[in-house]
Amino acid sequence: MNWNFQNTYTELPDVYYSDTKPYDFENPRLILFNSDLANKLNLNVNSNEKEICDFLLGKKNKEKKFFSQAYAGHQFGNFTILGDGRALLLGEHVYKNNRFDIQLKGSGQTPYSRNGDGKAALGPMIREYLVSEAMHHLHVSSTRALAVISTGEKIIREKFEPGAILVRVAKSHIRVGTFQFGSLLKNKNYFNNLIDYTISRLHPEI
């Protein structure tokens, strides 16, 4: 398996992201793997389970720059700066002139985690995997799920639950909240940088 990674998002001012390292889980195990999506991304899956897990968790790309994105929005009725509190971007996989964000959800703490552990439970990650694939096959644009990986940990929620990571794929993780965050910066150049980048990446025909 090989990524064809680029990181054009980090060409934006660094207020829009923070460098993040994934937690090094000792006993990851592949629970679900979307071979159809992997083939569409030209990942050439001919590896054993451990190699697939190491590959998907970024262990084969330790020299690369991983990061979490900043954004803002409403939470519990209040407008606040949020950011990826339990997700990071491994990079942008490029295939046939198409660019896909590869994101790990539940990979550990980030600079935006606040008091959270940055991790995720297995049940919700399986549920998101199933729902995102259902949305895709119903022709509703959304993220897609490449894999669910058990971390081998027990994490504390209402009770102890098995931990997991969801590997998500999307054309971009830029969202409304990214622009809400940009507007808070009171820096016209930074905001225009974001607008120009988004148009160039997602709507070059404009």
Kindly label every feature range from the protein language model.
Residues I155-I206:
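ATP-dependent phospho-/nucleotidyl transfer catalytic cores
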Residues M1-I126, L130-R175:
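Broad phosphate/nucleotide-binding scaffolds in NTP-utilizing and phosphate-metabolizing enzymes
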